[in-house]
Amino acid sequence: MEDAGFVAHYPEEGRWGLGVAAFEVGAAYLRHDPLERLARAPIQRLAAEVAHITPAVALLGVLHGRETLYLLKDAPSTPVTIVAEVGVRLPASLTASGRTLLADLPAAQVRALFPNAASFVDRTGAGPMTLRSLNLLLGEERLRGWAEEDGFISEGVASVAVASHDHDGRPAASVGLTFRSDQADRGARAVLAAAARRCAREITRRLSGSGAGPRA
């Protein structure tokens, strides 16, 4: 049942509980509780891990239609003012957290989510506003291995994000880091993305049931 995603081990709690697959017959929000429980500790560790690079907020997000819904947030001791909060929804086409999940979806599904120009939202004058420009960006980010936005949501604020996957290999949630644009150059952003990727892999491992212990 663990391999199928119906039960999951919560290492920090030292017990077993219902997994993501057990909730798939219900409304989408019912899946969030096991996902949050599995991801909370890795997200907290991620925020601590990158603190020496730059103050960055670690976020866990999921797709909710054309929006990114944020489920977890771990903020650094040095404040970083961002729009994303737990429970907040932002345009998936603009957020790194949303696009890293869109990049793993079939092209037909992305097309269905963004059928026309009215499907796109403009916040700062930056970011994709057509399906063609979105697909070009998704292609670049798919090749790079992470999504990135700079000023698409808030001017002066940037993010990187990587997708984690469920027991069937489908994009389940995004692991993102948000920081001030002027406090992370290209090299630093690559390091942040690598840290987010390690965290996303840990969450994928937990979701897929490929081991019960915490990350070493």
Enumerate the predicted regions with their spans.
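Extended hydrophobic
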Residues: 126-200, 204
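N-terminal helix-turn-helix
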Residues: 1-37, 201-209
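A short, flexible beta-alpha/helix-coil linker loop
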Residues: 23-25, 119-120, 180-184
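Residue-level recognition of specific faces of alpha-helices
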Residues: 3-6, 21, 59, 156, ...
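Short helix-to-loop capping/linker segments positioned immediately adjacent to catalytic or ligand/cofactor-binding
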Residues: 45-50, 58, 121-127, 143-150
